[in-house]
């Protein structure tokens, strides 16, 4: 079983770029990597970083992708910049954008969502007994019941995320009208498709509940030691918050024509509707969902 120390993040920069290519229905073919670092950076760190990129390519299923070059430089801080390039297949020559969804389309998702956020919340709690257990392999007092594999999955999702890259090509072949990788939160990225395509997006409450259910025991672990929040409703609420507002899982959110057979790996989450107001909305059930997720240029 891996420890937290062995899960040092080394694959995130490549995974997020591979996901961007997949979200346009393309196949990643090469990465160009630029790395600037202080002169005292150890060779072992650089080797581990390079291995992480290679591992990420394999874990994401981007089997035709290579690292074709890049640049090295000296700087006060470590800076990583990766450019990914991909190719469209002959039978799907046009990239899938976020702006092509139509009213009546099915909204579907491939990958995992909410797990990276749960992992981050665990990592931000240095006092959490689960972290001590995984680091020292010792049990540290009474803790809520939770599968250690679920904790490990959440930590791995945050520190070494993967994206279902082959699903992007499958989606394009199946006629996807719009697609985006979920890096900033399911609601936030659904909202981006809604705005770009001028549609309302209605997410099924039942589908969100199904995605949230496996995270409820983790929510209990995260809230452990916070008595005011320790009730079943709080656990469910936090699990749904991870699914709806958490980012960095890099799953694929796509829209397909009504009645289309969803490609392997995708599950239906809802549908696109004719917008009722002046601005497109994302609905959860019958109610407008409050905006959640990461906004890069929003003042802190």
Identify the meaning behind each predicted range:
Residues 24-34, 67-70:
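Short beta-strand segments at enzyme active-site cores
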Residues 95-169:
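Short, acidic (Asp/Glu-rich) active-site segment that either coordinates a divalent metal cofactor
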Residues 68, 108-110, 202:
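Structural detector of well-ordered beta-strand residues that form the stable sheet scaffold
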Residues 17, 25, 67, 104, ...:
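Residue-level signal for inorganic ion chemistry
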Residues 14, 120-123, 171, 189-193:
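Buried hydrophobic packing segments
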Residues 1-24:
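Active-site cofactor/substrate anionic-group-binding motifs, chiefly glycine-
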Residues 1-4, 31-40:
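Glycine-/proline-rich flexible loop or hinge segments
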Residues 5, 39-66, 73-80, 85, ...:
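Glycine-/charge-enriched secondary-structure boundary and capping motifs
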